[in-house]
Amino acid sequence: MPPAALQATVSESVKDAIISKLRQPPSAVPSREWSAETRTSLTPADAGIAEARASAEDIELVDLQHHNFSEPRKRIVSPASLSRFEHSQAFAEILAFICVCNTRVVGKTLTEEIQISSACRTILEMLDQVAALRESTPPDASIGSSRFGNPAFRTFYAKIRENTDRLHRMIPGLETDSEWSRAARAELSVYFQECWGNEKRIDYGSGMELNMACWLLCLCKLRILRLPEDGACIVLRIFWTYVQVMRDIQSSYWLEPAGSHGVWGLDDYHFLPFLWGAGQLSSHRHLRPKAIHDAEIVDEFAPKYMYLACIQFINSVKTASLRWHSPMLDDISGAKSWSKVNQGMIKMYRAEVLKKLPIAQHIFFGSLLRFPEPATGELEEEDVEEDAHGHIHPAGKPHAHGTGEGQAAGWGDCCGIPIPSAFAAAEQEKKRQQGNFSSTMLGEKPFGTGVRRIPFD
């Protein structure tokens, strides 16, 4: 299993210096609010109301043995279908799940003891087995100098597909061969399969991360996981383990950032660790958002807090300062408190993830997460199978794409900006300087001393 966070040895003298810094009053360092551009995207007129009132009661529970399951499929294919989703029960349940989990991690760290139910332990075992599948599937060393996704990812993805039903049989209540158990496993398996990346494009983004959240939400709806009781474990153990497994997958197979905003995004791949990570810190008495600029503080507290672990990870693969390679994170660090950051992250997730077609089109809808029926007189848009670039569009309305492999082909607006993997870019820079073959292709991790970080992607 990949480590919970990049560890750094901090001497006692450094710890004393950190404590001294934390005791400085907030006014000792100038603070600024998020920029006007950021605030505009985070504060739609109705944002904040639903988030503040969200509770576990907003999530409809179903009876596992008396529920009519159906295989999920993608239904968001146009702005019109996206609008229907925004006003649906599924939208409200996804947001409620995120907000309830957020409240359960306030003031908690990654290292403290928390209650872990038997169902949570089983899910952690499932993630361990996925990590083992990754370890047993080395990257393809024959691709040479390609800076885009490694085709061995498709082999790994096929192994996930082959083992998905077996893994779901590990979950209490889903191990039998009864009709309802098979149907439940089939519906859950779609979300689980899709949360590891896109097999065709060899990429990963917040849409795939959202599928993991939907999988966990569906387990809650089936009463396998329980909210709010399991909320802290869902985030601090299950989801964080998932992120570590994904970091291993991303760095091993050079997954391309799906739909990345480049330097104008939070992270090439993830969003929720920042949202829930800010929730962890929202009640901290000393740490302030500006602390992300202090390497000593980041190294000391990264093992405890997801947000700082993500900052440490970004700094491990990119050089220069956050202001240059992550201006959004730099801008957010000017907020007065982590509570403000957390509130902004929830609004941003609502506006920039759940309400954006390039990401929302990856959501699957079945019997647990239901897509709303069309209103009287409204036509149901016909969706089609995924095309060669791994997206779906209304029938007869595909857009043109260039030739090439993965995002190197140059997708349209719905498919994001073609950006090679930062891991691949760093490895290629090392190869250029040293003239030897990629260490990642030999099975090493790209975070050793021999890998040169890159300025930004």
Curated annotation (Swiss-Prot):
Ranges for region Disordered: 387-407, 426-457
GO biological process: one example: response to osmotic stress
Localisation per UniProt entry: Cytoplasm
Name of the molecule in the record: Serine/threonine-protein phosphatase 2A activator 2
Reaction(s) this enzyme catalyzes, per UniProt: [protein]-peptidylproline (omega=180) = [protein]-peptidylproline (omega=0)
Biased composition (Basic residues): 391-400
Phylogenetic lineage: Eukaryota, Fungi, Dikarya, Basidiomycota, Ustilaginomycotina
Enzyme class name: isomerase
Function: PPIases accelerate the folding of proteins. It catalyzes the cis-trans isomerization of proline imidic peptide bonds in oligopeptides. Acts as a regulatory subunit for PP2A-like phosphatases modulating their activity or substrate specificity, probably by inducing a conformational change in the catalytic subunit, a direct target of the PPIase. Can reactivate inactive phosphatase PP2A-phosphatase methylesterase complexes (PP2Ai) in presence of ATP and Mg(2+) by dissociating the inactive form from the complex.
Cited Pfam families: PTPA (PF03095)
Claim: Protein biosynthesis is one of the keywords in the record: no
GO function term, MF aspect, one: peptidyl-prolyl cis-trans isomerase activity
EC number assigned by the record: 5.2.1.8
Principal subcellular localization: cytoplasm
Protein family: Belongs to the PTPA-type PPIase family.
Cellular component GO terms, alphabetical: cytoplasm; nucleus; protein phosphatase type 2A complex
Gene: RRD2
Keywords: Cytoplasm, Isomerase, Rotamase
